[in-house]
A protein has these predicted regions:
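Active-site loop segments of alpha/beta catalytic cores
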Residues: 110-264
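Short, flexible active-site-proximal loops enriched in glycine and acidic residues
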Residues: 61, 89-90, 130-132
Length: 264
């Protein structure tokens, strides 16, 4: 937490973005009994794998076991994690009419399992070990919503973005509002810092980011409860770092493509 606040620290703190996973026998045993989504929606087990991973690795923070796409189900999207394919959205958004059908995420009860997992994790963790909550950033969530899953070229996303800016911004605004509520609910439940994952934003040019993404990401970050550190992370973002800083965040996450000694 001191590092997030840019205070002096005795060493560089370390945590991993996906701490709980297949390397853990306990995780494999749980997954043998249930799907990934079922695990995410079972607070006691999500808390257990969160705590076990943090203790096993000896890291300086825990990150709650969840997924960035959990928030899209309350929007009215049909989410499935298919073996070998990853996430699939069966009713993707491709038009203004589809955008109009999306629902506001205005009731935290729809994601209560995440909040319960945070509460259980916070009770079980060492008091000196911070707990990080997280969510997907607006563009990355929008790209999943429009593409219907992962993509290599984001053709559907960019088609909507370029051809119907009104629908695009309406969707991004709706997503951003839901994210503010969701992240603040995580903080109220016990998360001491939050991270925005913009995993796919590196697919955009700086001009596109500035026009179509930056205002919405900034809305989310500014809406997070004051005093809670926000980690703003993206991949393939060497051309976007200044704009990401403009969008906000106490910490800007870097990927493996960047040499730290060249940044300041």
């Amino acid at each position: 937490m001191r590092a997030c606040r840019r205070e002096a620290v005795p060493y560089t703190p370390i945590w991993l973005m996906r701490q709980a996973g297949r390397y853990m026998q306990e995780y494999r045993e749980v997954r043998a009994r249930m799907s990934f989504l079922e695990l995410c929606k079972t607070p006691s087990l999500a808390a257990e794998v969160t705590v076990t991973a943090a203790e096993r690795l000896g890291v300086d923070a825990a990150i709650i076991f969840a997924d960035i796409l959990l928030i899209i189900e309350p929007m009215g999207l049909q989410l499935e994690f298919s073996k070998g394919e990853g996430p699939v959205i069966h009713n993707p958004v491709r038009s203004a009419t589809d955008v109009d059908r999306l629902r506001e995420v205005d009731d935290e009860a729809a994601l209560s399992f995440v909040l319960d997992a945070i509460r259980e994790t916070r009770r079980a963790l060492r008091r000196d070990l911070p707990l990080i909550g997280f969510a997907g950033a607006p563009f990355t969530l929008a790209s999943y919503i429009v593409e219907g899953g992962a993509s290599k070229n984001y053709v559907h996303t960019k088609t909507l973005m370029y051809n119907d800016g009104g629908a695009w911004h309406a969707m991004m605004s709706l997503v951003a509002r839901g994210l503010v509520r969701y992240l603040n609910a995580q903080i109220e439940a016990g998360a001491q810092a939050v991270q925005l994952f913009d995993s796919w934003v590196g697919a955009l040019s700086p001009d596109d980011y500035k026009q179509y993404v930056l205002p919405h990401t900034r809305e989310v970050i500014r809406g997070v409860k004051e005093g809670t550190p926000v980690i703003h992370f993206g991949t393939g973002t060497s051309a976007l770092l200044e704009l990401m800083r403009e969008a906000g965040g106490d910490v800007i996450g870097l990927d493996w493509r960047l040499r730290l000694e060249l940044l300041h």
